[in-house]
Amino acid sequence: MNISRLMPNINKHLKRDREYIAPASNSHEGYSVPELVLKYGSIWSKARAIPNLGHYMIGCLYQLKKSYRSLYRQPLEPKQEISEKDLLDLESLARSLGACNIGYTVVEPSYIFSNSAILYRNAMVLDILMEHGKIRSAPSKSAEKEIFRTYYVLNRAVNKIKEFLNSRGYNAQAGPALGGEVNYPLLAQKAGMGHIGKHGMLITPSFGPSIRLAVVYTDISNLPMSESNEHSWIPDFCETCNRCVNKCPAGAIYKDTVIYEDGSHRYIGYKKCSVPFSKDRGCTVCVKECVFFKGEYNRIRDGFMKKKKD
């Protein structure tokens, strides 16, 4: 079964005779969760989960299709600068739709997947909490349902935000959590929201790695872009920890992160990861075993910094 033909895809809607942002020559190929499950895991295991996840799966698919169908529904005379009131209203709406933290940055072309593209270079990045009580039980039906709940909430949120920006006269493109055209952890890291850990997920001060990410792209020129990242100590800490490496049931997380000639990283073997993800309720062991999930961010940072000085 060729899942790429069944899944909504931006390339089916992109108008190549109009301006868009293409991936860089060194961009990596991107896969959606369903594609990885079908390519390396067990679609039948996921099919058995439909009674538990059906509502969210259908909702995610609907919102994903909606994001692509609305690509070119934009204002006739779009504004390039956002007013203070509109920015406040934008962030208030995002939080009312479930977003916990918000960051802004410029998309690097190398972050765009090689088999994709986007319309606008500036990005509003959103995260949402996967509830710790449910993720702590992973792998379980409860944790699996929470994973897909957050996918659905974010997919719906970015479409609502896109519609809001359009209604105020700004260009916008929704970047759903399930699917998407860009490496979201890299984008969120660049936006100063956290830092990627050894497991390849974004670690945030608020919730550790127990989050999902989504994006809204725009050409608004005066967004409050992040200029720095105060979380760059995390990779050094991860080198002393390796808990996720040791706890991964598939042995999918590389103890020595693969670093390519262009400086990009590969943290996990997707083939190995997809097997327990598809067969064992979305797995998520790497999230619940991460020390940033279990402990307070500031306490971990202060203890690590003190140890480095001693």
Predicted feature residues:
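Iron-sulfur (Fe-S) cluster-binding modules
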Residues: 1-106, 114-119, 288, 292-310
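Catalytic cores of enzyme domains
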Residues: 91, 100-310
